[in-house]
Amino acid sequence: MEELEPELRRRVERAPVARLATVRPDGHPHVVPITFALDAGTVVTAIDHKPKTTTSLQRLRNVEARPVASVLVDHYDEDWSRLWWVRGDGSARVVTGGAEREQAVERLVAKYEQYREAPPQGPVIVVSVARWAAWSP
């Protein structure tokens, strides 16, 4: 597992949203925006109370069938000298209970004020990042 440079880590930790990419059964990518928390070499996201079109979410099925994922965090600015992105690629798993899930939810609650009122009740996806890639001008 690679470590993320301190400045890039700070940027990722402050970002409010990331994109989670998983692989559909037909091999095509599936990308969704997520709330997330970073801890050492893992990125966690949870299925929360925000309205969903179904309870059988594609991202969960994808991870269970093919346990790989990428998480992309980026920043856009009209001043292109301030653009940047960081991507973590790794293995992924769905966690439905136990201490690992509770710790992930605690990290999300600490980051997002909205979760203090309604902590995520659904499964957690844990991405163990094996490789970080980044770009900035």
Go through each PLM region and give its residues:
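Charged, gly/pro-rich active-site loop segments
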Residues: 2-3, 76-137
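Short, conserved loop/turn and helix-capping segments at secondary-structure boundaries
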Residues: 2, 53-57
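Short beta-strand segments
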Residues: 16-52, 71-73
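Short amphipathic alpha-helical segments and helix-helix/interface helices
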Residues: 9, 57-60
